[in-house]
Swiss-Prot record:
The keyword Nucleotide-binding applies. This is Arginine--tRNA ligase. PANTHER family: ARGININE--TRNA LIGASE, CYTOPLASMIC (PTHR11956:SF5), ARGINYL-TRNA SYNTHETASE (PTHR11956). It comes from Thermobifida fusca (strain YX). GO terms for cellular component: cytoplasm. Monomer. PROSITE patterns: AA_TRNA_LIGASE_I.
Amino acid sequence: MADPQTVLARRVQSALGAAFGPEYRDTDPVIRPSQFADFQANVALALAKRLRRSPRDVATAITEHLDISDVCSKVEISGPGFINLTLRDDWIAHQVHDLLTDERLGTPVQESQNIPIDYSAPNVAKEMHVGHLRTTVVGDALARILEFLGHHVIRQNHIGDWGTPFGMLIEHLLEVGEDSAEAAQLKSDPNAFYQAARAKFDSDEDFADRARRRVVALQSGDAETLRLWRDLIELSKIYFNRIYRKLDVTLTDAHLAGESTYNDMLGPVCDELAEKGLAVVSDGALCVFLEGFTGREGKPVPLIIRKSDGGYGYATTDLATIKYRVEQLKADRIIYVVGAPQSLHLRMVYETARQAGWLGNAEPIHVQIGNVLGSDGKILRTRSGAPVRLMALLDEAVERASAVVAQTRPDLDEETRAAIARDVGIGAVKYADLSIAHDTEYVFDFDRMLALNGNTGPYLQYAVARIRSIFRKGGIDPAQVTGPIQVTEPAERALALKLLDFGATVVQVGDTLEPHRLCTYLFDLAQTFTAFYEACPVLKADRDEVRNSRLALTAVTLHTLVKGLDLLGVRAPEQM
C-alpha cells in the first residue's frame, strides 16, 4: 500500500512521459491537497514555460494521457491549469482495509543507512538539568523513527567523562571514601558531590595542588588514578540510568561513547591537520582558520585544536569523533542533537573534517535544540537562579498527573492510578517537547502540558483510552476486527484519508528530522476521529455491515495512534 500522494504522483509522471517524452517522466508532478478536490497536480504551471505552451494546454495534454480511472472518480482542470483529482471511495476503502493487517500501517522500509545519533550527553558527577531534556527526548524519538524506517541507528551518548575537573573529583572521592555516603550522592544527587569538591578546590590550596597533580596523573595513565576515575563514571551511570528509565528512553550503557573514548586519536588528529596545511600555530596554539568564518570585526575565527599549553579542547575531540564515526562506524549520516548555540562550532568542525577528507560521502547534520524557557521568557531556572533539576521536574509532572487521576478516577485501585499518572505525567513532558519545532524555544508550562484538550500528550492518550473503551464496551478485540471497510459518509471518508497519510508522515519526519510533524499528524487524526465518532454511530450502527466497517476504521485509528505515540516514546495507557 502506498499513500495517495505517492500513487497519484506516479500516475501523473507516467502521463508526463507519454505526453511530452521520456525526459519529462521524472518531473515533480507537484501533488498537493486541494480545497476543491482531494488533491491537485500543479505541474502544468511549472512546465508551461519550458514547453512554450499555456498551462491549461499542458494540463489538457496530461489528462489525455492520464491512466487513473481505477484510483480517481473525477479529474478536472481548473483555473489556469490546476488538475483536480478526486479519489474513488472504493479505492480509499480498499487501501484502508489493507492497513488492518499491516503492522507498518503503510510505512515503507527504506534502503538502510548507518546513522550514528549523538544525543543526551550529560556530564559525569553533574546533575542532569532541564537543558538535557530536549536533546534526550528529541534524539530518542529520531532514533526510534529512523529504526522503524529500516535504518541501522547507532546511538551515541557522548558523555563528559574527561577533563581538568576530574582532578578535584578524584581527590574528593579519596577524602570522603569510596564507600561513603558522600560518594553515594553521585547516584542520586551528583551536584552535591561536585559542589563539595569545588568548594574544597576554591578554599584549600593544598587540596587544589593535589587536584592539579591528579589531573596530570590521569592524563598520563596512572593505574590507580584511572581506577578511581572509572569509579566516578560507574557511580554516575547509576544516576544517568535512573533518569533514562524515568524518561522511558532507549539509551543504555552500551550506547556510552564519552569524550575519553577518543583520547588516543587527539594527537594524530592534530598532526594530520598540520601536515595537510589546515592547521597553523597562532599565539602558541594550533588552530584551523576557515574561509567564511569571521567575527564581528571581520577577523577570522579560529578553531583551536591544541592549546598553547599543549592541552586539547572540545574541537579536537569533536574532530576525532567525526573521523571515528565515518571510518569505524561507516556512517552515511551523522546526526548531532545538540543545542542551537553550538551551531557555529559544529559548522566549523564539519567544514574542517570535509577539507581534511574525512567525511567521504557521509553527511553530518546538526539538529538544533532550542532553549526551554520559564514564564518570564528567560531560560528556565529555579528561584535561586540554578538550572532546574531534571529528576525533580519529572517527579513533579507525575505528582501533578497523580492528583488529577485521583480526582477523576477514584474507582481505580491505587496501583492502576499510579501507573496511569506515570504514563500521563512523563508523556505530557515528552510530548510537549516534541510537538514544537526542535530549533525553537518554548515556555515550560505544566498546566498546558497536562491539559486534556489541545495538541498535548494527555489529549492523545485520552483519545486512545476512549477508543479502547469502545471495544471493551462492545466486547470486541480490535486485533480481530476484519471489516470490510466501506466509505459512504463524509466523516468516514475524512478519517480514511487521514489514516492513509501516516506512512508518508513518518517518511517526512525521517527526511526532515522534525518529530513535531508526527505530533501534528496524530493530533489531526485524533480530532478527525472525534468528528467521525460524533457523526457516525459505531456500536449502534443500524446495519451489521456498517457497524463492521466503522469498527474497522476505529481499529486502524487505534493502531495508528498507538504506533505514532510509540515512535515518539510516549506510552498509551489502557484507560484514563
